[in-house]
């Protein structure tokens, strides 16, 4: 099984292409550029009253980058609900390498010390490319996504790429755009087209407020110690709900 070069992987993301495998056991990886792309506009996350209530309750302890490898392994695991997966060992190793380089991040949901949900993705410029999520308890993946959106908004990101639209993501505000519109949005998020407030008919969060380097850890108050930068710590669910705005 051939390793995926991490620099090649980042270049692929920069032009809207990402890798997949046919199965967990597949030796080969193929590159995907969908004609229709799922994105979640950061200013239009659909926070239902029930989800807001769950987040406010702090039922889950939510962290960032605390257990990246475990999250990817859970997303790659074969379950009764997911008899196969597109994450083969080469893809898993490539994202672990990007994580070590600071280009891939995870959000984890914990319950009584157990990892019960989470997601991971790739960060490049002002874009975050969501790769996969999992849930071992009801609403855990929704909570993880809500915390991710709040983190991206606080950090000045412009684009959350969901790759493919699903009913689950659509219920949370994800939409589908054409390939051309997606590339325009991606160019804005990566700073190729600076100063534009919208692309492809979709507003880009924060674009009109000036151009500053996005910071995945801005939500943590700018902590510099590695052990504190990666943990959400004292941030409450109430704060996250406030960051996400009005409930629907």
From Swiss-Prot:
An annotated GO BP: protein catabolic process
Top class in the EC scheme: transferase
Main subcellular location: cytoplasm
Localisation per UniProt entry: Cytoplasm
Keyword Cytoplasm carried by entry: yes
InterPro entries for the chain: Acyl_CoA_acyltransferase, Leu/Phe-tRNA_Trfase, Leu/Phe-tRNA_Trfase_C
GO cellular component: cytoplasm
Protein role: Functions in the N-end rule pathway of protein degradation where it conjugates Leu, Phe and, less efficiently, Met from aminoacyl-tRNAs to the N-termini of proteins containing an N-terminal arginine or lysine.
Example GO molecular function: leucyl-tRNA--protein transferase activity
Protein name: Leucyl/phenylalanyl-tRNA--protein transferase
Catalytic activity: N-terminal L-lysyl-[protein] + L-leucyl-tRNA(Leu) = N-terminal L-leucyl-L-lysyl-[protein] + tRNA(Leu) + H(+); N-terminal L-arginyl-[protein] + L-leucyl-tRNA(Leu) = N-terminal L-leucyl-L-arginyl-[protein] + tRNA(Leu) + H(+); L-phenylalanyl-tRNA(Phe) + an N-terminal L-alpha-aminoacyl-[protein] = an N-terminal L-phenylalanyl-L-alpha-aminoacyl-[protein] + tRNA(Phe)
Lineage: Bacteria, Pseudomonadati, Pseudomonadota, Alphaproteobacteria, Sphingomonadales
Entry keyword set: Acyltransferase, Cytoplasm, Transferase
Tree of life domain: Bacteria
Family: Belongs to the L/F-transferase family.
E.C. no: 2.3.2.6
Annotated NCBIfam families: aat (TIGR00667)
